[in-house]
Amino acid sequence: MNRNEHYDPSLVTGFGIRLAWATLEMMTDDVKDLQLLVSGSQDDVDDLRISVENGRLSVSQPAYGLSTRIATERWMQVTLRIPRDWRGDVQASTMTGLMQVHGLSGTDFSLTTVSGTLRVNGLSGMSVTLHTVSGLLDVCGITAEKGSMRTVSGDLSLYRGIFRQLKLTSVSGMIVAGLDEAFEALDINTVSGAMSVQAPIMRAKIGLRSVAGKLKTEGVENTEDGPAISANSVSGSLTVTRSGSPAASDAT
């Protein structure tokens, strides 16, 4: 069953989306209306609650364990096609479903999954928060004043990032951060995962607090001035590489 809803984008200032196992995709497109497209079984589509109140588009799905219709195989796709000039705040979460975001611009973004992969390709906002527990966090082409990305056991990969302040956190997952511009402050925290930073900087104030991990720099001088990189870990090591250095070229 398919369900298609259309909204005037000037009347929608934000999204509030809470899904259980459904897949969520949000993308900008050459459209005039804000389009909500849902595909799945009739029962599951009927279970979806959709409303617009006080300028906020809300989409919610019953949690898997609370649904009155539990099946062994279930599939539902929720897609938002958004006009390219739309700006607003976005709060979206899934439990096990994949979440994909393409080309969105807005104010504040909060995107969360439990075990589903969170994949972002093109995002611009004032504040961006990305969080997953065991899912992969795969981010490319993101610009924000402040950013916070957190995983527990999943790996965190960031490429082509532009931030003023950024915080990256993982317990056992590996953290890879590729930044396109110099930044003000970068805070990295892991327990056992390795940490790697690549940025177009020649010097930085780098601090690593670790029991067993080690600090390695390639083309970056560790000084008392410049962007601040603060890392904390039990056993994870930190590598900081200047973009364009031989080590950075070898890594790509």
Model features per residue range: what roles?
Residues M1-S60, E73, Q77, R81-P83, ...:
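Short linear S-[DN]-x-LW-Φ motif typified by the pepsin-like aspartic protease active-site region
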Residues E5-H6, V139-T252:
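Short, surface-exposed interaction patches in beta-rich subdomains
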Residues L11, A20, E53, R74-M76, ...:
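Repetitive beta-strand solenoid architecture
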Residues G14, D33-Q35, D47, D89, ...:
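Exposed beta-strand and adjacent loop surfaces of beta-rich binding modules
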Residues F15-I17, A92, L111, L130, ...:
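Active-site alpha-helical segments that house and flank conserved acidic catalytic motifs
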Residues T68-T72:
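Glycine/small-residue-rich loop that forms an oxyanion/phosphate-binding "nest" at active or ligand-binding sites
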